[in-house]
């Protein structure tokens, strides 16, 4: 199949291209009766949209969401919800010089090999522009999860290139352009990005996400485990090259006595597993991290080939994010919410009336 749909019971199908007339998605499976309006979706879209600081692409898009179906008199009807976001600031002429070649490290080459040709304008279907409707769908899922289960999903940037960002406070995340939870390091991040932009290069980033108040029991072993589906969704985000759940790769260096999350009647003593055991939520916070590569669209020349396989030097013009990770936090939150809502509905369908009889252990010691 085409790979444009995420989820099984809560399904999100994305459509559009970066420089087409519009982008959007169809959200199928949202239960009826939830109050929903465009303002519920717009907040997260505004957090993601371009042109919000000097450190991101200067493409100017209002990213205004239109609800075309699935909502009547301010409530979801249980039928598919269609969201539309119109593209307003395309500059397709900026891509004329790369239409007959391939940016090294970009999907230009692989899209052409797969489909036989490609839309070169802004990356076409491979553009991060397509994450806007995902954020819209994620806002719906976040609202439902919060109202139904009290689940709160929050993300932050935990590293920018070589700069680690120590976590300090959730209160700081939306107070700066980097989604940094640490106000003290923001001036250093700004200086780093200013120098990077002047150099013409790009850089990667690490984004972390935490979902709190997820009940125990969600996840479908063996092959639809909660962490497997979360990793699958997060790997679908543009430029993501790695996903960690909990301690992730560090688990390979740990001893069993260190990694195991010991349990007491008063609560779990640690959360190295990231809230998932055996592919099923434990009731602890779901914790994931994504590694985002540097964008390949930059003004520094690089070697490549043209459509005839002949060597050529590529320089990318146009408006690009020098670090795509800066705007990724709302997208990572959205994908996490979509996966959790899908699993909430799947768990309710199969095991909604199961009573284990085992007391629920608090997520952590207070």
Curated annotation (Swiss-Prot):
Binding site for FMN: 125-127, 238-239, 278, 293-297, 319
Keyword annotations of the record: Amino-acid biosynthesis, Aromatic amino acid biosynthesis, FAD, Flavoprotein, FMN, Lyase, NADP
PROSITE patterns: CHORISMATE_SYNTHASE_1 (PS00787), CHORISMATE_SYNTHASE_2 (PS00788), CHORISMATE_SYNTHASE_3 (PS00789)
Subunit structure: Homotetramer.
Name by which UniProt lists this protein: Chorismate synthase
Note on cofactor: Reduced FMN (FMNH(2)).
Signal peptide limits: none
Needed cofactors: FMNH2
Domain of life: Bacteria
Pathway assigned in UniProt: Metabolic intermediate biosynthesis; chorismate biosynthesis; chorismate from D-erythrose 4-phosphate and phosphoenolpyruvate: step 7/7
Species this chain originates from: Thiobacillus denitrificans (strain ATCC 25259 / T1)
Catalytic reaction equation(s): 5-O-(1-carboxyvinyl)-3-phosphoshikimate = chorismate + phosphate
Residues that bind NADP(+): 48, 54
Enzyme class at the top of the EC tree: lyase
GO cellular component, one term: cytosol
Protein role: This reaction introduces a second double bond into the aromatic ring system.
Pfam families in the cross-refs: Chorismate_synt
Family (UniProt): Belongs to the chorismate synthase family.
Any one Gene Ontology molecular-function term assigned to this protein's record: FMN binding
Matches recorded under InterPro entries: Chorismate_synth (IPR000453), Chorismate_synth_AroC_sf (IPR035904), Chorismate_synthase_CS (IPR020541)
EC number: 4.2.3.5
Protein biosynthesis in keyword set: no
Record GO biological process: amino acid biosynthetic process; aromatic amino acid family biosynthetic process; chorismate biosynthetic process
